[in-house]
Design a protein with these regions (language model features):
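An amphipathic, aromatic/His-enriched active-site/gating alpha helix that lines ligand/cofactor pockets
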Residues: 2-4, 38-51, 69-103
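Short, well-ordered beta-strand segments in beta-rich or mixed alpha/beta enzyme
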Residues: 15-23, 52-82
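Short beta-strand/turn micro-motifs at beta-sheet edges
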Residues: 4-11, 54-55
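Generic hydrophobic-segment detector
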Residues: 10, 39, 58-59
Length: 105
């Protein structure tokens, strides 16, 4: 994701942060990281209001963390409400055993 901005953690910035923790079988961790990375680079980053995303993998192989920033909750909601976005999110969830999204300011 060389063209995607790196996340900036600054309490003075007024952005919406999504922390999405996926629980995965260790043999599927790389698959989910690749799917998230490629889809973010090819599609998600082009949506209005997208700021940045960082994909992290746990050392034990059982988790993938997607730390994403959006300009506002309205921008994020608009993205999530699109049928194509719902398909992408379902694809990611299908690779994982569980997913725990948290929205933060």
């Amino acid at each position: 994701m060389a063209d995607t901005k790196i996340a900036s953690i600054d309490p003075r910035r007024n952005v919406l942060t999504l922390v999405n923790i996926y629980e995965v079988e260790p043999e599927r961790q790389a698959e989910l990281v690749q799917a998230l990375s490629e889809t973010t680079e090819q599609a998600i980053r082009h949506h209005d209001g997208f700021v940045s995303a960082c994909i992290h993998r746990s050392l034990d192989g059982t988790k993938v963390v997607n730390y994403a920033q959006w300009a506002s909750k309205q921008h994020f909601d608009a993205f999530v409400q699109q049928p194509a976005s719902r398909e992408l999110l379902a694809r990611f969830a299908g690779i994982a055993k569980s997913v725990a999204p948290t929205l933060c300011t």
